[in-house]
Amino acid sequence: MAKVLYITAHPHDETVSYSMATAKAFIESYKEANPSDEVVHIDLYKENIPHIDADVFAGWGKLQSGAGFDTLSAEEQAKVARLNELSDQFVSADKYVFVSPLWNFSFPPVLKAYIDSVAVAGKTFKYTEQGPVGLLTDKKALHIQARGGYYTEGPAAELEAGHRYLGTIASFFGIPSFEGLIVEGHNAEPAKAEQIKADAIERAKALGKTF
């Protein structure tokens, strides 16, 4: 049985969002094809995702100096403990499904905060004399992203930073398989929007059977 983290970074649901509608079709297809797998939904707009702030750095610093966890302030304890929960949960999974829109050439900031929470030396990567090495070498990841315009080809391709960044992070973590399910052009060509959405949903259903 595999454990899948279904990580959504969108304030809207599938009735409004193309990425969420595509993701819903994918995850339903996946569950049907893999009924014994555990799928854990992490809605980043509803979860407590601490930012790496002064409290976190202070707490980490105290722990690294040998101080006990009980010496941390209440704020430091809460944030450090939550970050540990998130990173442990991430490492425990076998597959990751990230869902986001393309906003300002990237993704919503809550997804960056989540990535920061799981990018932990000794858990998702380690330092060696040759440089950092990823530790998640037996995992796989998928990014479902909707883009109102066209960014796969042409001059705008260099502007898209969200999907490319997630690919970089996956590689940094050692994840050998990173796929993209991209939905694009529905704002650029409104007359084709419903067909674009329908095509994406069909692709999602097919991928859900094999992911």
Swiss-Prot record:
Its EC number is 1.6.5.-, 1.7.1.17. It catalyses: 2 a quinone + NADH + H(+) = 2 a 1,4-benzosemiquinone + NAD(+); N,N-dimethyl-1,4-phenylenediamine + anthranilate + 2 NAD(+) = 2-(4-dimethylaminophenyl)diazenylbenzoate + 2 NADH + 2 H(+). Pfam families: Flavodoxin_2. It comes from the Bacteria. Its cofactor is FMN. It is an enzyme of class 1 (oxidoreductase). Coiled coil: none annotated. The keyword Transmembrane does not apply. The keyword Mitochondrion does not apply. Binds 1 FMN per subunit. FMN binds at S17, Y18, S19. InterPro entries: Flavodoxin_fold, Flavoprotein-like_sf, FMN-dep_NADH:Q_OxRdtase_AzoR1, NADH:quinone_OxRdtase_FMN_depd. Keywords: Flavoprotein, FMN, NAD, Oxidoreductase. GO terms for molecular function: electron transfer activity; FMN binding; oxidoreductase activity, acting on NAD(P)H as acceptor; oxidoreductase activity, acting on NAD(P)H, quinone or similar compound as acceptor. Homodimer. HAMAP family: Azoreductase_type1. Quinone reductase that provides resistance to thiol-specific stress caused by electrophilic quinones. Belongs to the azoreductase type 1 family. This is FMN-dependent NADH:quinone oxidoreductase. It comes from Bacillus pumilus (strain SAFR-032). The lineage of its organism: Bacteria, Bacillati, Bacillota, Bacilli, Bacillales.
